[in-house]
């Protein structure tokens, strides 16, 4: 995959502190890792709860539970961010 691929991150609501909302705090590390690798990142909210999907060229290349991503940070120590980056790099 070229270094300047457009990656769409589709994410759903999740429950925290008794409320269910769209929150982007758990996506900070994922966005940072993808941008550092030269990719353009677009965020899209979806109706599904607790899900993150990475879309490259119209194809879903990675999916995980949003609550399993590390909160905040740069994503360098989060193993799910490394898996997601690998999936984007090997997408075609």
Curated annotation (Swiss-Prot):
> Which organism's genome codes for this protein?
Branchiostoma floridae (Florida lancelet)
Q: By what name is this protein known?
A: UPF0728 protein
The UniProt family comment states: Belongs to the UPF0728 family.
Pfam families in alphabetical order: UPF0728
Ranges that cross the membrane: none
Q: What is the lineage of its organism?
A: Eukaryota, Metazoa, Chordata, Cephalochordata, Leptocardii
């Amino acid at each position: 995959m070229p270094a300047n691929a457009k990656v769409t991150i589709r994410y759903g609501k999740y429950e925290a502190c008794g409320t269910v909302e769209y929150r982007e705090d758990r996506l900070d590390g994922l966005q940072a890792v993808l941008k550092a690798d030269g990719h353009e990142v677009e965020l899209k909210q979806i109706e599904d709860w607790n899900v993150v999907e990475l879309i490259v060229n119209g194809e879903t290349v990675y999916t995980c539970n949003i609550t399993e991503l590390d909160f905040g940070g740069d994503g360098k120590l989060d193993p799910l961010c490394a898996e997601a980056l690998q999936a984007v790099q090997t997408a075609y």
